[in-house]
Amino acid sequence: MQLTPEQVKGRIKNVAKENKTDARTLMRIYMMERFLERVASSQYKDNFIIKGGMLVTAMVGVALRSTMEIKDIDLGDGVTFEVKEVSNIMDEMEYPGIRFTMNAVMGKLVTPMKIDISTGDVITPRAIEYNYKLLLDDRSISLYSYNLETILAEKLQTVLARGLLNTRMRDFYDIKTLLSIYEQDIDVDVLKKAFEATCKKRSTENLKEKAPKIMAAVSDDAQLHTLWKSYQKKYPYAADISYEDIMESTMLLGSKIQ
């Protein structure tokens, strides 16, 4: 059954209230799901690997053409996508690629969103098939995804490479959350290989040796403490997680690659 814009808005508000989450963030997630379901329903399904956040990795160089076709797929959900801008990703050191700035439109609901599509990422050992549970529907869609070890390896590499210059607190939060839920599922040998492969891809092969010293400096840095407090104020889901908590988790992850 197709939901009306008013029904979607109402359900989003209820979920936000129950989970103490920002309704606008949930609306972006819902609209991202509408795009991902179009990916799952398209002929390009096997060419895309979901990485997390708003980043999608495209294989075999089909990013621009396929994305333009995917956005026009009609699933009968009342959602359309308007591409406002297509640009090269220039502000991230981790990956080159294309950024799509678009509006997801459902009746009078207009939700701005960005989707980053990169190529050439290293996944160790390989992508996995993932059943993505939808936010408002009691069903899942099947997509290819990064495996846990590669996700953690990339986040750890980012934290170490940026060091005291890091302004992206989300990686610390993600490491804390992923370890809290999935630590027992981590294959340490795969994690080590994924970290080495990521460092090689990003030309930071010496990070493993430098990791303990970098971690100690990051742990004691007053500016990063302040940035984390700002992140907590902006995102209620992080309010109960201290800087010491995220550093403990990050150091734990770092110890697993030694």
Each PLM stretch: what is its role?
Residues 1-48, 58-258:
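Structured mid-to-C-terminal alpha-helical surface segments
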Residues 55:
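Catalytic metal-binding/acid-base residues of hydrolase active sites
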